Amino acid sequence: MMKNRVTNIHFVGIGGVGMSGIAEVLHNLGFKVSGSDQARNAATEHLGSLGIQVYPGHTAEHVNGADVVVTSTAVKKENPEVVAALEQQIPVIPRALMLAELMRFRDGIAIAGTHGKTTTTSLTASILGAAGLDPTFVIGGKLNAAGTNARLGKGEYIVAEADESDASFLHLTPIMSVVTNIDEDHMDTYGHSVEKLHQAFIDFIHRMPFYGKAFLCIDSEHVRAILPKVSKPYATYGLDDTADIYATDIENVGAQMKFTVHVQMKGHEQGSFEVVLNMPGRHNVLNALAAIGVALEVGASVEAIQKGLLGFEGVGRRFQKYGDIKLPNGGTALLVDDYGHHPVEMAATLSAARGAYPEKRLVLAFQPHRYTRTRDLFEDFTKVLNTVDALVLTEVYAAGEEPIAAADSRALARAIRVLGKLEPIYCENVADLPEMLLNVLQDGDIVLNMGAGSINRVPAALLELSKQI
């Protein structure tokens, strides 16, 4: 139906991770796709290389000829392209609604949760690929093995992230869903009510048909709390032997995790098998268990699961290793980049770094994301930031918010200093961070560059500076 009525699809804010992936898949399905964005980035360059028209900036003329206009939550109603589309009676729809349309073409597998969505979606796509199922995927980060965050496969499944930040995951109608965990984040969306947050995830699970299946992580307290209200078929996973799929004998082997998977899921052969996951961290064992559950449900073999996890090449900005960088005083430091910006994610990633490189001094460069999050989770940030060996804090990435008194990086630095363990270094401008880090780092260190904002540009700048040494 959509193919008969829609030819030209225009994306406002096409360079965003969620938007660019959907645009690429639609282009590969044969639609004429265009888009606009204020900033040029790797995603807009990639889309341009595919033949997609990407306009710099936003003007009303860009929507001329469009059958539908797709927007992300970052795009304001006053955007000239949105205004022009509405004046011309061109439908303006959120990104999630277009993702829901894509799920009409395939059987959808939607991965939700406060943390771990991107990694779990990527692991699921990797295993399904190893099983020869050739899935379509739309991921919030670049799947390193594919070199992109989206791909149109020939198989029957589409694997996609389901975004709870604006409750837009309630547009999706998957046949299978995953909830990796539930945490108190993006609470403005839910009126600062845990009950409303819980209900949104219950409603998301209930978007499946009666023959669908959800995979729910019982290591999450909030997930356990919603289980009695879930009326659609589900299986549980976790590190507890009461789960339908659980892991034991978890072992850190360098930057990999080795563990035994036990399956006691209804309708499946009971038993256990060993796997090696090609990424560090106990939290990633949980992400792998979710992907294993989905894979077993679609009929993937144990061999395909083992192959997909061992051959996993990671995701952009999820414990992404850049290798050793040269230091001005001699020696080298290992550079790792990560998107983590919530204290729970950060604690898991820092623990993974300690487990993978126990002998190294851990240096963290961190850019908080949003003043509201810094304010709401101030104590949690202080605790997790105090666990590293050296800390460089750059100013909060506002993401469109106005500054909030005592919810900035200077306040965090003061609070950490009072604890008496660390002397945080404050870097007001993120552009100065690469040079500052080179002066802080010592031979043999691991430096973790972390945050969801403009700090993502630091690794490239650091590598460039390092080459000049």
Swiss-Prot record:
Identify the EC number(s). 6.3.2.8
> Which GO biological process categories is it annotated with?
cell division; cell wall organization; peptidoglycan biosynthetic process; regulation of cell shape
Cite the InterPro entries for this sequence: Mur-like_cat_sf (IPR036565), Mur_ligase_C (IPR004101), Mur_ligase_C_dom_sf (IPR036615), Mur_ligase_cen (IPR013221), Mur_ligase_N (IPR000713), MurCDEF_pg_biosynth (IPR050061), UDP-N-AcMur_Ala_ligase_MurC (IPR005758)
User: Per UniProt, where does ATP bind?
Assistant: 113-119
Q: Which domain of life is it from?
A: Bacteria
Which Gene Ontology terms of cellular component type are present?
cytoplasm
Q: Which GO terms fall under molecular function for this chain's record?
A: ATP binding; UDP-N-acetylmuramate-L-alanine ligase activity
Major localization listed first in the record, in broad terms: cytoplasm
Identify the keywords attached in UniProt to this record, alphabetized. ATP-binding, Cell cycle, Cell division, Cell shape, Cell wall biogenesis/degradation, Cytoplasm, Ligase, Nucleotide-binding, Peptidoglycan synthesis
Q: Which family is it part of? A: Belongs to the MurCDEF family.
**Role played:** Cell wall formation.
The name under which this protein is listed is UDP-N-acetylmuramate--L-alanine ligase
